């Protein structure tokens, strides 16, 4: 007996119960065959996966990539080039093979020694918690997790940490929130901002010119940062001072750098602290950095005047778009290169790129910038799922979000790398400001 499209169908899972209509599932024969005399389908499947499949059939914009294995068992045809099945803790995932290999060392070895199973590796159980694995997947895609304590699991899978290479001497403008900053020389009015001896480097933080200080190190900053000590002159000598009170804003270990807000050498803060004597703010504040931390460069930044701030600066256009085709059917490629002179307008020589994003059907791995063949920046990209774009994370330090601005100089060459060879079009979006 045929069923009407409005006939309710109950679906029972391992840990839940759902209802849909026959009209939603009737085009999928495998699901129809599972309907019993009580108009019920019993599935040995988790409820969250069934819910995703049903919403997909109802026309919602949701992806079934990760659960394609279960979807295909129910008669849906979900397939993508370069994707394979893996089994983690009894749950099968459909993943981009090249992408997961590039991010997790574990899977390079796993695929190498089990290549005879390609493309379905689900017969081999990776004995780890699948719920934690899903957080690992979110982590390597640049998405936020509710639980950031993944170090043990990331160590197990052998996370390939993105390599950040930054040569600060090539970048003169920075931004953070709504403020813009310009790099200033380390000597103003014949007063040095820092000096060093055989034991440590001393950086003076109480100059009225300085707003931010960025310190780049030669190697990764250790967990124990006792080699960074703040001192304030009190009475007849210097006393150690609390790091947070001294403006230590954030530490980025992946980029081997720290960000410090300079303590103003002025009386501005006295307005908010009426009981504090003015002389308190004129006492020198110093940061002492042990030589074992190996400072590579210290960058002093001055906040640009209010008429130079992004909110008051004339944006030439909300976004410019620059499109670059690459690859061909006979010659696939995994990168595309271009020079700034190809898309920045000569009419605006005094400008900086404020925001940048990349859009491509192919997955982007990282971005490289060279100046006269010298590598000045290597940066990963963050995927923004809601907008289906990648944002270039040139320099982002924790929640402070300090970013480099790219000056309009024609000697800069961009190269965008992809996870696999392809034919595609790269869309480069950017917003520029007058300086």
UniProtKB/Swiss-Prot annotation:
Entry similarity comment: Belongs to the mimivirus BTB/WD family.
A GO BP entry: protein homooligomerization
Origin superkingdom: Viruses
Ranges for domain BTB: 80-149
Organism of this sequence: Acanthamoeba polyphaga mimivirus
InterPro entries named in the record: SKP1/BTB/POZ_sf, T1-type_BTB
Residue ranges that the Swiss-Prot or TrEMBL entry lists as coiled coil: none
Entries under Pfam families matching the protein: BTB_2
SUPFAM superfamilies listed in its UniProt record: POZ domain
Stated name of the protein: Putative BTB/POZ domain-containing protein L275
